[in-house]
Amino acid sequence: MRLKPLGDRVVVKVIQAEEVTKGGVILPGTAKEKPQQGEVVAVGTGQYIDGKKVELEVKVGDRVIFSKYAGTEVKLDGEEYLLLRESDILAIIE
């Protein structure tokens, strides 16, 4: 991984939505929902709040759900990533 996020930013590898429904219907690209899940592949160093350094809650390897239109899309080595602020992450999937 050549992306090293700064501050409270997180790099997430996007997990693509299913292309076939449970009923066997193949969805065209225009009908698919924008992905909202991914795996954390890199985290920033944290942020300073009131002069104290606060570490990020998420860590590399966590599966997360994030806001639908959050972050900046980045393509690197044929893979699709999102660069998000930690506050754009809604939940960690356990």
From Swiss-Prot:
Keywords from the named record: Chaperone, Cytoplasm
Superkingdom field: Bacteria
Annotated CDD domains: cpn10
Cellular component aspect of the GO annotation: cytoplasm
Gene3D superfamilies: GroES chaperonin (2.30.33.40)
Biological process, per Gene Ontology: chaperone cofactor-dependent protein refolding
Cellular compartments annotated: Cytoplasm
UniProt-recorded Gene Ontology molecular function terms: ATP binding; metal ion binding; protein folding chaperone; protein-folding chaperone binding; unfolded protein binding
Family per record: Belongs to the GroES chaperonin family.
Protein role: Together with the chaperonin GroEL, plays an essential role in assisting protein folding. The GroEL-GroES system forms a nano-cage that allows encapsulation of the non-native substrate proteins and provides a physical environment optimized to promote and accelerate protein folding. GroES binds to the apical surface of the GroEL ring, thereby capping the opening of the GroEL channel.
NCBIfam families named in the record: PRK00364.1-2 (NF001527), PRK00364.2-2 (NF001531), PRK00364.2-4 (NF001533), PRK00364.2-5 (NF001534)
Record's subunit section: Heptamer of 7 subunits arranged in a ring. Interacts with the chaperonin GroEL.
The name this protein goes by in its record: Co-chaperonin GroES
Organism for this UniProt entry: Thermoanaerobacter pseudethanolicus (strain ATCC 33223 / 39E)
Gene that produces this protein: groES
